[in-house]
Amino acid sequence: MSTLLTRRHFVAGAGLAAAAVSTRAWSVEGGFDVVIIGAGLAGMNAAMLLSELGANVVVLESEPRPGGRCRTMDEWYLAPDLGGAQIGRDYARVLDTAAKLAVKLGPGAHINAPYSFVLDDTLIAAQDWESSPLNRTIGEERAIAPHTLGGHYVEARTPFTAIDGWLQPEAANYDLSLAQWLARQGASAAAQQIIRASIGRPLETLSVLRMMQEATRSRIGLAKIDAELLKGKDQYERAGITSQHVVGGTSRLTDAMAATLGERLRTGERVTTIDMDARGCTVRCAGGRRYRAQYVLAALPFSVLRRIDIRPGLRGAQAEAVRGMPYGNQSQVWLRLREPYWEKDGLDASMWTNGAFNLIRQQIEFDGSRELISALAFSDNAVRLDAMPHAERGRFAIAEIERIRPATSGVLEFVGAHSWLQVEGARGCSYQMTPGRAFDWTHAMGKPHERLWFAGEHLRQLEVGMEAAMESGERAGRGIAELLMN
């Protein structure tokens, strides 16, 4: 944004625009400057920025609550976060917003207990993995834990040294599938099978360029941390060591952001159509309400955006990305522990498996308490789990864990179940990229289309996770602000 765009100048400009509203046919249903669709971190960050500059903004959220995939289950035992639990030390926008809104942060974030491994229903101690006859990997792979094999072949070998490396022209050379990359790196067939089981998706469908972006950002962020402290840990465990957490759960942050917007945030408003012409935009909602604005910002996952009728329609690589971007699912079953079962069998508490649950994570809170397990099913496993009622998912998870780990018998209690695919405002968890199209999509899909702008974690450029969402909201908000002043 230009340094000339001060709050005083913006408000003055907005006043002139408002004066013109009464004489313009496009001023219908309120004459907003911007309609923002989606009240996650990206949408609310953009709304706060634009509101501070004097813009007349309304935020429409289809769900009954703001926050997007940041959600603290306050009604569950110990109120776990279902997403957005870790605030990295480099999350400048998140940290600044928390400070500005007096949202209390605490040191550390939950981490997962070290892993044992369950391969073909056989429980293997971590120290026995390298010599196990079930470990069919070869060479140096044998010493690498199953849940960190992907990191060994991608994170440790990303060619990028700068956080914007994946945006440079030469990055197109790495627009490959994970299967292609692993073959180039000489990964054994057994290693590829393990990585496939860890992710839950065919390796041919996964973009290694997208994975390299995360890997590079993580590597740069962790460069000053003792390597021994990070050894043998997956990306989430490593992040937990250096992260902070929101006291009371991450929803306290998104609730505070929503509170600053007040009546400008409207929940239960599912957008069905975005109509644009030379004079402005009309946004129509399922309940019949219409909103008129100069610009629209769609801060939605593409899994949701592609269900909205956009006129005129998107074109080229941008249309292709919105229409075809794959989204994974993470179906979660949360359990309470009555006893420390790991003391019975002497094995590490968390489990990687190639069975019904990809990861069974025993959660160690920032204060050292250990009372929760999250059993996570990805992709095809998640589809099967999601077909069950919530209580049945709990019974299934307990029975499965007791079967593969007898020491857990009688010590687990169902807390709750959640699937991001079954949330209409999310329709999936993490976004993916189609191999061979990731580079083009990355450079096309975030560009404005007519009067429609875009934001969301999937439009990351330099950051990851919560900070990527905030980054994209800020970028779109500033771009729209510039236009409002012209």
Write out the residue ranges for each language-model feature.
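Glycine-rich FAD pyrophosphate-binding loop
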Residues: 52-72
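N-terminal secretory signal peptides and thylakoid transit peptides that target proteins
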Residues: 1-17
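Active-site/ligand-binding neighborhood in enzyme catalytic cores
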Residues: 161-269, 278-280, 299, 433-434
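Conserved flavin/dinucleotide-binding core of flavoenzymes
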Residues: 13-15, 53, 128, 280-282, ...
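Short hydrophobic core segments
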Residues: 37, 291-303
